[in-house]
Regions:
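Histidine-acidic metal/acid-base catalytic patches
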Residues: 1-7, 14-31, 60, 99, ...
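Active-site-proximal loop/turn and secondary-structure-junction residues that shape catalytic pockets
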Residues: 9-11, 39-41, 72-75, 107-111, ...
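N-terminal substrate-binding region of glycoside hydrolase catalytic domains
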Residues: 26, 31-46, 70-73
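Residue-level detector of anion-binding/catalytic polar loops
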Residues: 33-34, 65, 101, 139, ...
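Conserved beta-strand positions in the central sheet of alpha/beta enzyme cores
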Residues: 36, 68, 104, 141, ...
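Glycine-rich, proline-tolerant flexible connector loops at the mouths of alpha/beta enzymes
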Residues: 36-59, 113
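Active-site acidic/histidine proton-transfer and metal-coordination neighborhood
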Residues: 58-61, 77-174, 183, 279-282, ...
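The substrate-binding groove and active-site-proximal loops of carbohydrate-active enzymes
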Residues: 73-81, 116, 226-233
């Protein structure tokens, strides 16, 4: 199994369009030759074809493979001013140009919708994209998202598989988000059984860690942290359960990290003598590289332990 990285933490260092090659070079320097490419809405609002062609050229020259992509996150049932169908059509075309075989497109929800309403609405939504999917040849992956405060019903592998099966089209598959799954109580979501339930529909992973689910009386809050495995005292994803599931289903995709370290996405501001101080807001790039070299080594250890690592 190949290791992969979604280099989203570099969004805070660089212009993801103008500095595209630099981002790819840094990712490769950490050991990763497979990536999960994040398609920005700003690309789709401009000359996205030129950006896609340039990305393809850079990937080829640098020896990097984009095994999967992520579309802009838009709630199709409350899209605001965004034309979500146009955004998703362009996202699929973007992938077609670059040669990315599959893309994650999130489901949507309405406040307090029932499970039946959630399923019916999303079946109609995803089926509306079948013509674009067939035209481009790019698979659409559904991802498990949400937590107990939301009205999403993709809490575990069985529910995700239920929606995919209802779509009844061979080009729909699953992206299992390991960290999202960890936000639920184990009785509602468990890594091994979820991966097994997805079976041959599982095409991609988002691997990251968090503090998981705690009862409301506990001192920690649930939060989608996207941290590196093993670095937090309360990190609680059971990677043995995940890995055994991948082994048992013969998973063929990449082991893709979607970590947002070492850049903190949220930080209270500090003002001193009338100026906002940001000296320690983020690590310098050499330290970013060291941390993500460590991430690669952690992934290699995990895969080698289960006999899955492909150099």
């Amino acid at each position: 199994m190949k290791l992969s990285l979604a280099p989203i933490s570099l969004d805070r260092y660089f212009d993801t369009d103008k500095d595209m090659r630099t981002i790819l070079e840094l990712t490769r320097d950490c050991g990763f030759t497979y990536i999960d490419y994040d398609i920005k809405q700003k690309y789709l609002d401009g000359d996205y074809i030129e950006i896609a062609e340039r990305l393809k050229k850079n990937l080829t020259e640098l020896g990097i493979t984009a095994a999967q992509a992520h579309a802009p996150i838009i709630n199709p049932f409350n899209p605001g001013e965004v034309d979500y169908m146009d955004a998703y059509r362009k996202s699929l075309h973007f992938c077609q140009i670059v040669g990315i075989p599959r893309i994650v497109i999130h489901a949507g929800c309405l406040p307090d919708n029932t499970k039946e309403e959630f399923m019916a609405n999303n079946i109609a939504f995803y089926r509306s994209m079948i013509p674009f999917m067939e035209e481009t040849g790019v698979e659409i992956l559904l991802e498990n998202i949400g937590h107990y405060a939301d009205s999403y019903y993709l809490r575990n592998g069985a529910e995700l598989r239920e929606l995919i099966d209802a779509l009844d089209h061979p080009m729909f598959g699953a992206c299992w988000d390991v960290g999202h799954a960890n936000l639920y109580n184990k009785k509602d979501c468990e890594q091994y059984s979820s991966v097994v339930a997805l079976g041959d529909k599982l095409k991609a992973l988002h691997v990251h860690d968090n503090c998981g689910y705690f009862e409301k009386s506990y001192r920690h809050h649930r939060i989608d942290m996207h941290t590196i495995p093993y670095v937090s005292l309360y990190a609680s994803v059971n990677y043995d359960a995940l890995m055994q599931g991948l082994v048992d289903i013969g998973y063929q995709g990449t082991f893709n990290f979607e970590t947002n370290a070492p850049v903190p996405p949220v930080r209270f501001s500090f003002e001193y003598e009338g100026e906002i101080v940001r000296k320690l807001e983020k690590l310098p790039i050499p330290l970013w590289k060291q941390m993500n070299v460590l991430l690669y080594d952690i992934g290699k250890f995990m895969l080698e332990t289960y006999g899955l690592f492909e150099g």
